């Protein structure tokens, strides 16, 4: 046992004297490596009598544990000392301002889509989506738009190219998101409350029109839904979206193939000083179209028009974004101008909600 005591002290001294990690590793290998001195002594236990093995084995295990603990402690001490030395050599000015990292912004179209979704979700509407390439049946026939209707002409609608002998029905880039309403009715039946936001396509290009733009349409079906429900829904939407206490809407008789009766909706506003103010003034501004769903459209969606009725409405997301945020030219939405995006964009944390506020 006295030999083990001497061996213990020898290794503890060598561990204390190790000046770096390499020297410490040499001590570890000499003591506890596969060919180390203590490891070799452990291998000799098999040749001893049971009594000797019990006594010597316990002593060797204690020695091994003590050496291992000393090695770990010394290693940590060397690492701490190296860190202290490096910190003393390096100089860091904690008052120096950080380098700004480039930040992206949320596009106004994405932001307004989220705002609209949040408002209608609060009224119990869910979001429905559908394909942007539609058959002419979903885009026209199911919506009571006959073959002779002007909207079906090639100068208004993007028809997909196809071979002359292709037996499939004509395909178009959808001109509105109304086909999604047909698909939603076919999928779930009535009652139903959905909004259908998405891209739509028409052959038009000027300051307030682009070949691709964004639209949101809404559909609500029930047993006793009337124009009064439509009026309340649109008033609540406009009040929440434009963030004003009072709004006044004007319903003008119009014609849409998929609704009967149909109405275009104007909102009272003021242009005093060249600035648009919603909810006051003597002017009126058209913002959306609406009406009671035509019985033929209900039938195309698999709904019995004798038992169910409802309303539908639609508006351009790009247009209401321009009105709310004072954006003068629709084409700028799609030009990918970083300066424009920084000016009109929204921070990633500006998540709209009815309770917390829609806009910054």
UniProtKB/Swiss-Prot annotation:
It is found in: Cytoplasm. HAMAP family: Phe_tRNA_synth_alpha1 (MF_00281). It comes from Paracoccus denitrificans (strain Pd 1222). It is an enzyme of class 6 (ligase). Transmembrane segments: none annotated. GO terms for molecular function: ATP binding; magnesium ion binding; phenylalanine-tRNA ligase activity; tRNA binding. InterPro entries: aa-tRNA-synth_II, aa-tRNA-synth_II/BPL/LPL, Phe-tRNA-synth_IIc_asu, Phe-tRNA_ligase_II_N, Phe_tRNA_ligase_alpha1_bac, Phenylalanyl-tRNA_Synthase, tRNA-bd_arm. This is Phenylalanine--tRNA ligase alpha subunit. The keyword Metal-binding applies. It catalyses: tRNA(Phe) + L-phenylalanine + ATP = L-phenylalanyl-tRNA(Phe) + AMP + diphosphate + H(+). Its cofactor is Mg(2+). Keywords: Aminoacyl-tRNA synthetase, ATP-binding, Cytoplasm, Ligase, Magnesium, Metal-binding, Nucleotide-binding, Protein biosynthesis. Binds 2 magnesium ions per tetramer. The keyword Protein biosynthesis applies. Mg(2+) binds at residue 260. One of its GO terms (biological process) is phenylalanyl-tRNA aminoacylation. Pfam families: Phe_tRNA-synt_N, tRNA-synt_2d. One of its GO terms (cellular component) is cytoplasm. Its EC number is 6.1.1.20. It comes from the Bacteria. Belongs to the class-II aminoacyl-tRNA synthetase family. Phe-tRNA synthetase alpha subunit type 1 subfamily. Tetramer of two alpha and two beta subunits.
């Amino acid at each position: 046992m006295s030999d083990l005591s001497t061996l213990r002290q020898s290794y503890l001294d060598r561990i204390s004297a190790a000046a770096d990690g390499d020297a410490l590793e040499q001590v570890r290998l000499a003591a506890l490596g596969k060919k180390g001195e203590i490891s070799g002594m452990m291998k000799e236990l098999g040749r001893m009598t049971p009594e000797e093995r019990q006594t010597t084995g316990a002593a060797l295990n204690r020695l091994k544990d003590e050496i291992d603990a000393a090695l770990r402690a010394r290693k940590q001490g060397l690492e701490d000392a190296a860190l202290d030395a490096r910190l003393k050599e390096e100089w860091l000015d904690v008052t120096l301002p950080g380098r700004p990292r480039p930040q992206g912004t949320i596009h106004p179209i994405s932001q307004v889509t989220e705002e609209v979704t949040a408002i209608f979700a609060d009224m119990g509407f869910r979001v429905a989506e559908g394909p942007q390439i539609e058959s002419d049946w979903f885009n026209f026939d199911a919506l009571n738009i006959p073959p002779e209707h002007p909207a079906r002409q090639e100068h208004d609608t993007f028809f997909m190219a196809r071979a002359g002998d292709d037996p499939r029905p004509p395909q178009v880039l959808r001109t509105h998101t109304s086909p999604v309403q047909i698909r939603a009715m076919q999928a779930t039946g009535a009652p139903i409350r959905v909004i259908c936001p998405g891209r739509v396509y028409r052959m038009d290009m000027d300051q307030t029109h682009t070949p691709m733009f964004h639209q949101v349409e809404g559909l609500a079906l029930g047993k006793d839904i009337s124009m009064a429900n439509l009026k309340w829904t649109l008033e609540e939407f406009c009040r929440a979206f434009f963030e004003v206490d009072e709004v006044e809407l004007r319903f003008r008789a119009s014609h849409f193939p998929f609704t009967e009766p149909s109405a275009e909706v104007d909102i009272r506003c003021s242009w005093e000083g060249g600035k648009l103010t919603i909810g006051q003034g003597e002017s009126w501004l058209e913002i959306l179209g609406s009406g009671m769903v035509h019985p033929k459209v209900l039938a195309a969606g698999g709904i019995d028009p004798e038992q169910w009725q409802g309303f539908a409405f639609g508006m351009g997301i790009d247009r209401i974004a321009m009105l709310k945020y004072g954006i003068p030219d629709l084409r700028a939405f799609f030009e990918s101008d970083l300066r424009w995006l920084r000016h009109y964009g929204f921070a990633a944390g500006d998540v709209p909600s009815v309770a917390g506020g829609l806009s910054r």
